[in-house]
């Protein structure tokens, strides 16, 4: 008998050579085998999971969640169920379920034009303004507020890429400033015309090293100011968020100083905080405290997450895996 584990489910053709003790071939045997996916035990031992409730949170504490891709998930056949096994198959019921379980804010990314010349979406939820409006309508029905995250690009932006939207290619800094102010203002009036859902707006996403193709601090701050004006002209009560990618290397300190120097009108300095990349909790606390005490601005974690398993479920290497980012820095 011999055991062999196939790489994936399917039909395999097997050729085996039979040899004598001296290594002489006696014959060859051909056959086929069909490999099936293994049955995976998805049961969770809840007795081993204890999450202590944080007491005395302020009434305005943000319990946020990003559901930017949920509409494309539903369209692709993804099924969510409530605790009673009832299927949730639309974004409105999904938001109501979240509200019933303590979520009070939804974060939604917006890309300028996430489609190619043939109208094919780039993926990632194809998060255009129309998609954000659908999610805003669902939030309104559920009584949830919304943070709109304008990447000011046609697809994902992060510290490594801050691509200029197709329609703005070749623009000067002044032209970009006029364009981003107009785009944000018009988009918000489409997403939430009644002005009762959106209460925070990110002008850019993880903009530590650049924004709309600009890497010079003065130019970036000019664009931040233009985007902020677009927000405040829409609704002066909406809070403007400037978002950097990490609290490490004094990033919040540096950028709060930069924003002060160039007199950018904003309300909150946000940061991403992924424990396996972004340092200790004590450093995060120190960076936030600096923004609050030095510049009298609010600060927040705008993005965070951690892996719920180290298992490989799809054949693609996990970001967090055994021996690589599999423990948090200071959690």
For the regions a language model picked out, list residue spans one by one:
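Substrate-binding and catalytic surfaces of secreted/luminal carbohydrate-active proteins
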Residues: 233, 239-240, 266-331
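Hydrophobic faces of well-ordered beta-strands that scaffold small-molecule active sites
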Residues: 61-67, 106-108, 146-150, 199-203, ...
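N-terminal substrate-binding region of glycoside hydrolase catalytic domains
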Residues: 40-134, 138-144, 153-179, 270-273
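Extracellular recognition modules
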Residues: 13-17
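Residue-level recognition of secondary-structure-to-loop junctions
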Residues: 4-8
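Short, solvent-exposed loop/turn segments at the edges of extracellular beta-sandwich modules
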Residues: 19-24
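Active-site cleft segment of glycoside hydrolase catalytic domains centered on the general acid/base Glu
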Residues: 121-122, 126-131, 157-259, 264-266, ...
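C-terminal edge beta-strand
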Residues: 29-35
């Amino acid at each position: 008998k011999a055991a062999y584990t196939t790489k994936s489910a399917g039909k395999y053709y097997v050729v085996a050579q039979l040899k004598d003790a001296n290594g002489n071939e006696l014959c060859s045997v051909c056959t086929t085998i069909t490999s099936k996916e293994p049955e995976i035990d998805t049961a969770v031992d809840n007795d081993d999971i204890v999450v202590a409730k944080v007491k005395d949170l302020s009434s305005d504490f943000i319990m946020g969640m990003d559901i930017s891709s949920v509409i494309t998930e539903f369209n692709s056949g993804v099924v969510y169920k409530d605790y009673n096994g009832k299927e949730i198959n639309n974004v409105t019921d999904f938001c109501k379920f979240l509200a019933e379980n303590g979520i009070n804010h939804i974060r939604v990314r917006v890309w300028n034009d996430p489609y190619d010349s043939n109208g094919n979406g780039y993926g990632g939820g194809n998060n255009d303004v129309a998609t954000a409006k659908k999610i805003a309508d669902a939030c309104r029905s559920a009584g949830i507020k919304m943070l709109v995250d304008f990447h000011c690009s046609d697809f994902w932006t992060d510290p490594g890429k801050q691509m200029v939207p197709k329609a703005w290619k070749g623009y000067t800094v002044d032209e970009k400033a006029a364009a981003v102010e107009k785009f944000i203002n018009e988009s918000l009036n489409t997403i939430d015309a009644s002005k009762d859902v959106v209460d925070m707006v990110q002008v850019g996403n993880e903009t530590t090293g650049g924004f709309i193709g600009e890497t010079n601090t003065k130019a970036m701050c000019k664009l931040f100011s233009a985007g902020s004006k677009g927000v405040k002209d829409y609704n002066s009560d909406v809070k403007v968020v400037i978002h950097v990618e990490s609290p490490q290397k004094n990033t919040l300190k540096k950028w709060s100083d930069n924003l002060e120097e160039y007199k950018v009108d904003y309300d909150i300095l946000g940061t991403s905080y992924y424990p396996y990349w972004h340092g200790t909790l004590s450093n995060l606390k120190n960076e936030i405290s600096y923004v609050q005490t030095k510049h009298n601005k609010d600060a927040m974690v705008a993005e965070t997450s951690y892996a719920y398993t180290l298992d490989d479920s799809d054949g693609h290497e996990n970001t967090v895996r055994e021996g690589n980012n599999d423990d948090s820095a200071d959690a």
